[in-house]
Amino acid sequence: MKSKHLFSLASVAMFVVVIAFGVRIYRVGDSARKEKAHWKKLDRILSEANFEGSYLLAKDGKILISSGRGDLSYDNKKVSDEKSRSTDPENDPNKIGRESTVAINSLTKQFTGVAIYQLANEGKLSLDATIGTYLSDCPYGDRITLKQLLEMKSGLPDYALEQALRDKYGDAIYSGMDPASLRADVMALTLKETPGEKFEYTNTNYFLLGLIIEKVSGESYENYITAHLLKPIGMRHTGFDWNLAAVRPFDPSKQGDGREFSHVFTFSAGEMTSTVLDLYQWQKYLYGGGFPGIVPQELFTDGGYHMGLNEKDGVFRHAGATHLYRSNMLYDTKTGDQVILLGRSPESDLNELTTELKEWIDELETAH
């Protein structure tokens, strides 16, 4: 009788273990299915946005995925398609990947902003000083401070949108013009608003900051940024001039490679090129306190725009757009999450796509 009772207990125990094991298998399988579906959703999001370029998503400071979509060149694609080449992105050197260099447009502005803060911390300039302190030949130099330039409150118009300036240079906007001539034209602009009163995004502000960096440091803008910002982080694939970028701009009007603004024209407001991997390191370094005294989350006290960045609720982001390139970057200081998009999709809304991808990262936790 006793042995019979023990046998019954053993049977029940085994049954419970089997059931529990079965439930565990079901849960693991269900979790795997959810996760697989979530990754399929990512591909769908990118496809529906018609995104072409490189992208990187990071959660808790760690890269989830870094890859690319599309061909490096549309002109090369036409030739290659005629030869029926393989389109395997893992083996095709003509496909955009995570190490492909792309024009980053106005993401350049945060590098300019950090450089200004570096020079201020070294006592070489003051954010409260006027432009004229450093650029003595600037007609409006005694009315605008460096801080107002950083915060887009100078009251100046956007030189890049001035029709008279575009008419003057014509094709040289793409092929390149004399830097001294462009500098003189930017200096000749007249105020639209009273400095300090109104926020208005304008490339002129960061163009002028680039000139101040050159004047104060005694180096060219490009040399200063390379030596003091890029090299300390190891950003070996970041540079200047879109002509040297691997990803060629796409011109929808001719369904082929197009031309982008000259790096002389965009200068310190938007001339840089980079990769998603380099920018991932940049954001980790910047928000992690790599530059002493220049931690964005400590400098931004009430949100808004400053030093080439927008901030709201601890999330920093900025967009970039030139003639044919588009870019967008996000960093969440609360989680270390990152979204980096470097594309040549002039008809895509990368602001909306960045928001969608951040939501996808947030939802990843529930997909496990």
Model regions: which residues?
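Alpha-solenoid HEAT/Armadillo repeat architecture
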Residues: 136-139, 214, 343
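Catalytic loop of the DD-peptidase/beta-lactamase superfamily, centered on the K-T-G motif
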Residues: 2-11, 15-68, 84, 260-368
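Short, surface-exposed loop or secondary-structure junction motifs
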Residues: 144-323, 327-328
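Active-site-proximal loop and beta-strand segments within enzyme catalytic domains
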Residues: 71-200
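Helix N-cap/coil-helix junction residues
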Residues: 51, 124-125, 219, 235
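Residue-level detector of secondary-structure transition/capping positions
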Residues: 120, 138-139, 154-157, 232-233, ...
